[in-house]
Amino acid sequence: MTALSRQIVAVVPAAGVGSRMQADKPKQYLHIHGKTILEHTVGALLTYPPVKYVILAIAEDDPYIRRLPLVRDARIQIVVGGETRAESVLNGLKAIEHPARVQVMVHDAARPCITHEDLDKLLRINDENGAILALPAVDTIKRADKNQQISRTEDRNFIWLAQTPQCFRAEVLCHALERALAQGLNITDEASAMESAGFRPHLVTGRSDNIKVTRPEDLALAEFYLSQRTNRENTNK
């Protein structure tokens, strides 16, 4: 069964509060061009034809999600998120019917600039190891000690910066996350859970504009990238 012969489902963990953003609401609900970041992100997934539906993992006491028009879309399913990203993703995976037949794309709620071209590249990988978008490191990488002094310089030829989406067979990822959480491992993305289970996910070169809005200065950058994309689309019409 090829990746495209499987049902493609997106899971978006959106239960975080984004404390580094220093805003009065979670970062996924900040606005760019009249829409929340979450709406831009989910819109990019819903307009990608292979995606059957999108599962949003939302904080149980989230007061914002029901105000958004996207919740009325029949292709949106909402589940309660967990205390960590891994738990939120796992809750989303458990909501998938027939997971053995599903290829899941897990995507950050605060990455609104994802392109369909990058999604195409991910789906070209068809084995049980799965694949993630990532960028080869271009800066010199320093490893620090506990005093924030340099302990050594890493070989950047082997360093990649992980992005999302991260794409795996839903059933395999579900088992990997359950196992990692049971072992108390520090799981910061889905690939790390797969690695802990013995898999070796593929690295697919992504784009530098697929940024995660994390700090205040990122908001203006995401706004710029989305504006540029809109301008190109209007020019090509």
Curated annotation (Swiss-Prot):
List the catalysed reactions: 2-C-methyl-D-erythritol 4-phosphate + CTP + H(+) = 4-CDP-2-C-methyl-D-erythritol + diphosphate
GO BP: any one term: isopentenyl diphosphate biosynthetic process, methylerythritol 4-phosphate pathway
The answer on whether this UniProt entry bears the keyword Transferase reads yes
Kindly report, in one word, the top-level EC class recorded for this enzyme: transferase
* Feature type site, description Transition state stabilizer: 20, 27
User: What Pfam families does its record include?
Assistant: IspD (PF01128)
So what does this one do?
Catalyzes the formation of 4-diphosphocytidyl-2-C-methyl-D-erythritol from CTP and 2-C-methyl-D-erythritol 4-phosphate (MEP).
Q: What is this protein called?
A: 2-C-methyl-D-erythritol 4-phosphate cytidylyltransferase
Q: Which organism's genome codes for this protein? A: Actinobacillus succinogenes (strain ATCC 55618 / DSM 22257 / CCUG 43843 / 130Z)
Highest classification ranks of the organism: Bacteria, Pseudomonadati, Pseudomonadota, Gammaproteobacteria, Pasteurellales
Name of the gene this protein is made from: ispD
